[in-house]
Amino acid sequence: SKISKSLNQEQNKYKIFLGGGDTVFSNKLSFTITSIGFANDIVYRNKAKINDDIYISGNLGDSYMGLLVLKNKIKLNNLLSKYFTKKYFMPNIKFELLDQIKKFANTSIDISDGLLADLDKMINSQKLSYKLFLKDIPISNNLKKILDFKKLSKINYISNGDDYQVLFTASKNKMRI
């Protein structure tokens, strides 16, 4: 079936094992996924240090734009609509960066609830403060064009979540990726 082929592709892509399933009768399709694993070197989300730099592994905001397209809250041409809805349904999780990040990150978290919400979880749990420069927060060229053309606020798009980029801090003297 198409579902089992897709699950097989994801297992190969992310080097995971699908160990079983839970079958229930329903007239709707439903999935529940539980992930269990082991880690030798854990980067916790509450170990930021004073004067750490803040990093983001990739662009923010595309997923939220995709959600707005799906909810018919914003109209875009067909090509851009497909681009953004794909980002919403299939975020590009950068697993290949994780080994590099854990070499020097003091703390990290995935951006699932939005940049500001997840940064607050990571930093404010330690009663630290932070300063962000909006111009330095990465967004795609597609999103930049739309924000400029429609005169929309960047902060609204980077703060809504579902981007699944890695947000992390590292000391200034650490080597960068």
Residue positions per predicted region:
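Helix-biased detector of long, well-ordered alpha-helical tracts
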Residues: S1-I177
